Regions:
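Transmembrane alpha-helices of multi-pass small-molecule transport proteins
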Residues: 54-102, 181-184, 204-220
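C-terminal-most transmembrane helix of multi-pass membrane proteins
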Residues: 4, 8, 268-308
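C-terminal transmembrane-helix exit sites in multi-pass transporters
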Residues: 109, 126-148, 268-287
Length: 308
C-alpha cells in the first residue's frame, strides 16, 4: 500500500494532535465547566428567590451593578485596562446590549413561570439560531451538518413545546425568544471582537445594561430586600460573573467538542435542582426533546471539527 498523500497526512496529524491536547486538558476543562454549571444553577435559584420581592428589572440591575463594580475594581488594580475602554463602535455596542438585555429579561421571567429543566432545554436552541443568522450577517455557508442540526433542533423544540396540546404554555415562547436574542447577541459580539477587546465588551455590556435595569426599577428597590433575600442577591451578582468567567476559561482550555458535552449536563443538573428545591416533576418530553436538540448540535460540532 502506498504512503498517504501529504494533505491526508497533515490532516491526520492535526487531528491526532488536537485529540492529545484535548485529553491533556480534559481535567482543566472539567474543573472550569463544573464552576460554570454550578454558577448557572445558582443564578436560576437566585432569580427565583429574588422574584419573591423584586421585579425582573430590579434583579437585572443587581446583576449588572455587581458586574460594573467588579470590572471597575479591575481597572483600578490594572490601570493599563483603561485604554481598552476608549469608546469604539458604540452603536454596535448599543444594539448588542439592548438585544442582550431583552433576552435576559425574557429568560429570567421564564424561570419564574416554567420548570427549570424546560427553560434550560429550550435555551440549547441558541446554536440553531446562530447557524441561521451566520449566513446573512457573517457570510458563512450552510453545510449539510448545519442544516441537519437546524432541522433536529426544530423537531426537539416541537417535542418540548407540543403546540396545540393542553400542555402548551405561552411562556415557552419567552425562552425561544430569549435563545434567539442570545444568538443575535453572539453574532454582534463576533463582529465587535474584530476591533474591540473582550474586557471592553464585558464592561460596556454591564455599564449599558445597568441603566436599562434601573429604568424599570423602584428607586428604593434595595429597601425591599429582607435578610432572607440577601443570599439570593449575592448569588445573582457572583454567578453572573463567575458563569461567564468559567465558561470562557473552559473554551480556552479545550476544543468546543470537549467543552460542549460538559455543558449539556446543565439539563439533568438543573432538573435535579428543580426536583429537590421546588418539587418539579421530571418531564420525559423535555428530556426527549433536549436529546434531539443536543444530537443535532453534536453532529454539527463533530462535522466542523473534522473539516477544520
Amino acid at each position: 500500500m502506498g504512503a498517504p498523500s501529504t494533505g491526508f497526512g497533515q490532516r491526520f496529524r492535526s487531528q491526532k494532535n488536537r485529540v492529545i491536547v484535548s485529553q491533556k486538558h480534559l481535567g482543566r476543562v472539567a474543573l472550569w465547566m463544573t464552576g460554570a454549571l454550578l454558577s448557572f444553577s445558582v443564578m436560576a435559584v437566585s432569580i427565583r428567590g429574588l422574584a419573591q420581592a423584586l421585579n425582573i428589572f430590579e434583579i437585572l440591575a443587581i446583576r449588572n451593578g455587581c458586574g460594573v463594580l467588579a470590572l471597575l475594581a479591575l481597572v483600578v488594580a490594572r490601570p493599563e485596562l483603561r485604554a481598552s475602554l476608549r469608546p469604539r463602535r458604540m452603536l454596535l455596542h448599543g444594539l448588542r446590549n439592548s438585544v442582550h438585555f431583552a433576552s435576559q429579561y425574557a429568560w429570567a421571567l421564564s424561570l419564574t413561570l416554567l420548570p427549570l429543566a424546560t427553560v434550560f432545554a429550550l435555551e440549547f436552541t441558541m446554536p440553531i439560531w446562530v447557524a441561521l443568522l451566520a449566513m446573512p450577517f457573517l457570510g458563512e455557508r450552510m453545510t449539510l451538518s448545519r442544516l441537519g442540526s437546524i432541522l433536529l433542533g426544530f423537531v426537539g423544540v416541537l417535542i418540548i413545546v407540543r403546540p396545540g396540546m393542553e400542555s402548551f404554555r405561552p411562556a415557552l415562547l419567552l425562552v425561544l425568544a430569549a435563545a434567539f436574542g442570545y444568538a443575535v447577541s453572539l453574532i454582534t459580539t463576533k463582529q465587535l471582537t474584530a476591533t474591540v477587546g473582550t474586557f471592553a465588551i464585558l464592561f460596556w455590556m454591564n455599564a449599558m445594561q445597568l441603566p436599562m435595569g434601573l429604568a424599570g426599577s423602584d428607586p428604593l428597590f434595595l429597601l425591599k430586600l429582607e435578610p432572607v433575600h440577601l443570599p439570593f442577591a449575592v448569588g445573582v451578582g457572583i454567578a453572573g460573573l463567575s458563569s461567564h468567567f468559567c465558561l470562557t476559561n473552559a473554551f480556552r482550555s479545550g476544543d468546543a467538542t470537549v467543552v460542549v458535552p460538559f455543558d449539556f449536563l446543565r439539563i439533568p443538573l438543573i432538573a435535579l435542582v428543580g426536583w429537590l428545591f421546588y418539587g418539579e416533576a421530571l418531564d420525559l418530553f423535555v428530556f426527549a426533546g433536549a436529546a434531539v436538540i443536543i444530537s443535532g448540535v453534536v453532529w454539527n460540532l463533530r462535522a466542523e471539527w473534522r473539516g477544520a
